[in-house]
């Protein structure tokens, strides 16, 4: 082993060694001052080697760890699989509930996270129930298990998904009620049978009172400010409107029917003047008996166009109104034209183009016929 000279030893090491260790002689006579510097130099070299190894480890180790932590190359065309699951209660997954740790083993942070998760799940469940609720179905929660939701089929078809209250207002399933008018009737308990019965009763009463469907629409417009067409009234009587519109229109027609019934017998009543229907009632259809009709037919064959005096005599004979007899003759002539359309347009056979009649002397038709009849046997 080579011992470096004293000139190569740092002065600090030699000074520290001389200060810290006392000078003594060993058994060979060599002083300790010559041995201690070599000892410190050896330890100094060892420390330098350890520092270099540590630096090498610090450089190599992060590189290896970084290589190990480097993300693997993703596979091509690998589609992520997303699974959407609605949040359920613990009773829906008992095997998962058993695997969860008991509550007393949870730390405060874990308990807070679990509480937040439960709150978010409950809010999502509420939002899901609100979104999935539609007007065409009803939601029912059982008393024993409020977390169970049952869907019931609607009693009406999808077109009939509305309900009415006492004021005739219409609202959707679960929506706020909006009053249509101040009229009140028993439309809260309205059902298809009630609407059908009311429509049939309304049609019978309207015809008996002599009002047309157009008259009813105009009257409703004058009373309530919304004129309904004749088609709407016709569709109501035929039950061709939706349940919502039937409920809207029923209280209006119910009120109009009460007013019309209360003013029966007074042709110029206040109700008719207010609705503008005075003098516009439909006249009842006249029914003529069979024997009276046969007498009228006899008079028609004798004279198709009677004058006013003859019409009056026929009316007195048959005990009919003069207007009824006049209208009957007019209708009978129209019927005759439909049966024989060319009868009234073709000229009379005994008339010329100038309108003067032809007599037998001017047109000896029979003599010509006899002449040709007599000549035919001679030719044979």
UniProtKB/Swiss-Prot annotation:
Any GO MF annotation of the entry: RNA polymerase II cis-regulatory region sequence-specific DNA binding
Low complexity bias spans: 1-25
Effect of deleting the gene: RNAi-mediated knockdown results in defective PDA motor neuron differentiation as a result of failed Y rectal cell migration from the rectum.
Disordered as annotated region, ranges: 1-31, 167-190, 265-286
Spans traversing the lipid bilayer: none
Keywords: Developmental protein, Differentiation, DNA-binding, Homeobox, Nucleus
Gene3D superfamilies assigned to the protein according to its UniProt record, in alphabetical order: Homeodomain-like (1.10.10.60), lambda repressor-like DNA-binding domains (1.10.260.40)
Ranges annotated as DNA-binding: 281-340
GO cellular component term of the entry, any: cytoplasm
SUPFAM superfamilies with a match to the protein in the record: Homeodomain-like, lambda repressor-like DNA-binding domains
Tissue: Expressed in a series of neurons in the ring ganglia, excretory cell, dividing neuroblasts in the ventral cord and rectal cells.
Domain POU-specific: start-end pairs: 187-261
Predominant cellular place of this UniProt entry's protein: nucleus
Subcellular location field: Nucleus
Subunit structure: Interacts with egl-27, sox-2 and sem-4. Interacts with wdr-5.1.
Role played: Vital for embryonic development and essential for the proper function of the excretory cell. Required for the transdifferentiation of the Y rectal epithelial cell to the PDA motor neuron during larval development.
UniProt protein name: Homeobox protein ceh-6
Taxonomic source organism: Caenorhabditis elegans
Source species taxonomy: Eukaryota, Metazoa, Ecdysozoa, Nematoda, Chromadorea
């Amino acid at each position: 082993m080579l011992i470096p000279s004293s000139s190569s030893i740092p002065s600090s090491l030699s000074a520290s060694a001389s200060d810290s260790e006392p000078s003594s002689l060993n058994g060979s006579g060599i002083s300790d001052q010559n041995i201690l510097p070599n000892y410190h130099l050896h330890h100094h070299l060892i420390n330098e080697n350890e520092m270099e190894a540590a630096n090498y480890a610090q450089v190599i180790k992060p590189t290896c760890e970084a290589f190990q932590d480097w993300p693997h190359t993703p596979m091509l065309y690998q589609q992520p699989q997303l699974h959407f699951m609605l949040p359920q209660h613990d009773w829906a997954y008992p095997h998962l509930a058993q695997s969860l740790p008991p509550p007393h083993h949870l730390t405060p942070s874990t308990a807070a996270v679990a509480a937040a998760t439960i709150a978010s799940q409950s809010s999502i469940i509420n939002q899901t129930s609100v979104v999935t609720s539609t007007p065409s179905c009803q939601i029912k929660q059982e008393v024993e298990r409020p977390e169970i939701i049952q869907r019931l089929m609607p009693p009406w078809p999808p077109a009939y998904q509305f309900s009415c209250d006492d004021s005739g207002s219409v609202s959707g399933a679960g929506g706020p009620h909006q009053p249509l008018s101040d009229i009140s009737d028993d439309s809260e308990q309205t059902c298809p049978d009630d609407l059908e019965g009311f429509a049939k009763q309304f049609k019978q009463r309207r015809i008996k009172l002599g009002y047309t469907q157009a008259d009813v629409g105009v009257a409703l417009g004058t009373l309530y400010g919304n004129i309904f067409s004749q088609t709407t009234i016709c569709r109501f009587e035929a039950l061709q409107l939706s349940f919502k519109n039937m409920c809207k229109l029923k209280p209006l027609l119910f009120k109009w029917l009460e007013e019309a019934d209360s003013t029966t017998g007074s042709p110029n009543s206040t109700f008719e003047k207010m609705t503008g229907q005075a003098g516009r009632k439909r006249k009842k259809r006249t029914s003529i008996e069979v024997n009276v009709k046969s007498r009228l037919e006899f008079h028609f064959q004798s004279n198709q166009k009677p004058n006013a005096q003859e019409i009056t005599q026929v009316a007195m004979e048959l005990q009919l109104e003069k207007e009824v007899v006049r209208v009957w003759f007019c209708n009978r002539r129209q019927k005759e034209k439909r049966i024989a359309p060319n009868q009234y347009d073709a000229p009379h056979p005994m008339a010329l183009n100038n309108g003067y009649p032809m007599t037998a002397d001017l047109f000896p038709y029979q003599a010509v016929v006899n002449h040709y009849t007599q000549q035919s046997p001679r030719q044979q």
